[in-house]
């Protein structure tokens, strides 16, 4: 990955997965809208002042996963479109066009655009893409822009930029915080019917739960891994780290001795396969996606499903009232043999907004001005009041607007130690082999040891 050519080959070939964050988006193919009006921008000492209004007419395009039809149910999306309305109302000579795609088609087009060096002025970038984009000079260095505006810098938490910092320079800013990609959503009524008063606390307990739930005719855990990222992002990132420790993850990134063939990492793969062989999951796990995995849960056919915090928005919107009333959230069960903390994967932001390195003049001023409008206390308040975690320092916000399940989630997050989500830090080609291999692992087409060897072989092909 030393050149754009190598990036091109990788990006076209790979299907990258997501953690965080646009995972509640619609599967609609695209959503092109032009934003040029909205509420007038309010002047407040609590807000960051955007760059000076460009004197000439400027047109910007934002490529994003924020589907406008989701604004009513997803506060991240609402904050995004509110920021466009606010900025264009205050800057009528600036027109912002939004090109929005759902997560998986977004990945595909972003890879193609990056390979052709045709990314628009503003776009979203995944943590694992960042180093390649920097090497290929696709993204603007934002460090000086941040450091030169002390008020703006104050609202940007470390979790907003951790995965987008290369050699001390910042190339992207997340609006949302990672929360957790590894949450256990469970129907307490079904568990009670089967004799359980609480969710499984350990993997040993989970194995017992699986046997009882199956005997009662329930799918223990609904899993949709068609897109191939759920098993990695929502399961293995935490399970693997509970055996290896989080320092191992960074040793992989920095190439300081860790290997995917290490016995502790193989233990995580082995546990995944053991759960599948016990019948913890539905047989069609590789034929349905992350949204479809919720349907058996909504229909009381499945007792549990494991996903990230983004699923809460869909639960609140799509889940039948009686099922929602019985739904609670917990961390995935502890790994009994773990000698390190029982991590939840997440914490840092998964997707960041980045600016094209090609921007200059009035277009650059406008893009920076909009970014400052989005990355603000006002946006943070909107995101938090809608029950989503935020990487930006908020002002005073109304916690009473949160649903009980959202409050339960935030309370849970106060007590868990975080590890990195693999797809946010490991190289894209390594993640691709890992994710494809997990599909095979869960249907017994490969052993844990062989999969570990395949991942390691791909890892060794790449340079630091």
Which stretches of residues belong to each language-model region?
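Short, solvent-exposed loop/beta-turn-alpha elements that line the ligand-binding surface or hinge
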Residues: 143-156, 242-267, 317-322, 327, ...
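Sec-dependent N-terminal signal peptides of Gram-positive bacterial secreted proteins and lipoproteins
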Residues: 4-26
């Amino acid at each position: 990955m030393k050149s754009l050519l190598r990036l091109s080959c990788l990006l076209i070939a790979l299907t990258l997965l997501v953690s965080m964050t646009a995972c509640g988006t619609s599967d609609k193919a695209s959503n092109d809208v032009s934003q040029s009006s909205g509420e007038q921008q309010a002047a407040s000492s609590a807000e960051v002042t955007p760059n000076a209004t460009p004197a000439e007419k400027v047109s910007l395009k934002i490529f994003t996963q924020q589907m406008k039809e989701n604004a009513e149910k997803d506060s991240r999306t609402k904050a995004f479109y509110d920021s466009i309305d606010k900025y264009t109302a205050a800057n009528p000579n600036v027109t912002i066009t939004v090109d929005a795609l759902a997560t998986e088609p977004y990945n595909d087009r972003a890879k193609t655009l990056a390979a052709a060096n045709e990314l628009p002025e503003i776009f979203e970038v995944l943590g694992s893409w960042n180093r390649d984009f920097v090497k290929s000079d696709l993204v603007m260095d934002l460090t000086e822009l941040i450091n030169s505006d002390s008020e703006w810098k104050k609202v940007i938490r470390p979790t907003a930029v951790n995965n987008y910092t290369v050699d001390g320079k910042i190339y992207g800013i997340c609006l949302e915080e990672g929360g957790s990609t590894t949450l256990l959503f469970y129907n307490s009524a079904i568990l009670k019917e089967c004799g359980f008063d609480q969710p499984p606390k350990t993997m040993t307990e989970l194995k017992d739960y699986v046997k009882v739930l199956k005997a009662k005719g329930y799918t223990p855990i609904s899993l949709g891994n068609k897109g191939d990222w759920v098993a990695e992002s929502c399961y293995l990132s935490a399970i693997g780290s509970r055996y290896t420790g989080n320092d191992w993850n960074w040793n992989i990134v920095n190439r300081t001795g860790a290997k995917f063939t290490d016995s502790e990492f193989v233990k995580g793969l082995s546990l995944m396969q053991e759960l599948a062989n016990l019948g913890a999951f539905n047989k069609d796990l590789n034929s349905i996606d992350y949204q479809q995995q919720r349907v058996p849960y909504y229909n009381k056919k499945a007792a549990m499903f494991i996903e990230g915090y983004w699923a809460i928005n869909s639960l609140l919107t799509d889940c039948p009232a009686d099922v929602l009333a019985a739904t609670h959230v917990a961390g995935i069960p502890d790994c009994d043999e773990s000698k390190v903390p029982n991590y939840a994967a997440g914490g840092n932001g998964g997707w960041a907004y980045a600016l094209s390195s090609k921007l200059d003049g009035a277009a650059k001023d406008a893009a920076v001005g909009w970014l400052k409008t989005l990355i603000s206390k006002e946006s943070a308040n909107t995101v938090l009041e809608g029950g989503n975690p935020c990487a930006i320092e908020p002002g005073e916000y109304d916690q009473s607007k949160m649903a009980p399940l959202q409050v339960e989630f935030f309370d849970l997050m106060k007590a868990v130690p975080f590890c990195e989500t693999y797809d946010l830090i490991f190289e894209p080609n390594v993640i691709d082999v890992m994710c494809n291999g997990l599909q095979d692992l869960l249907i017994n087409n490969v052993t844990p040891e062989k999969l570990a060897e395949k991942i390691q072989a791909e890892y060794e092909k790449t340079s630091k």
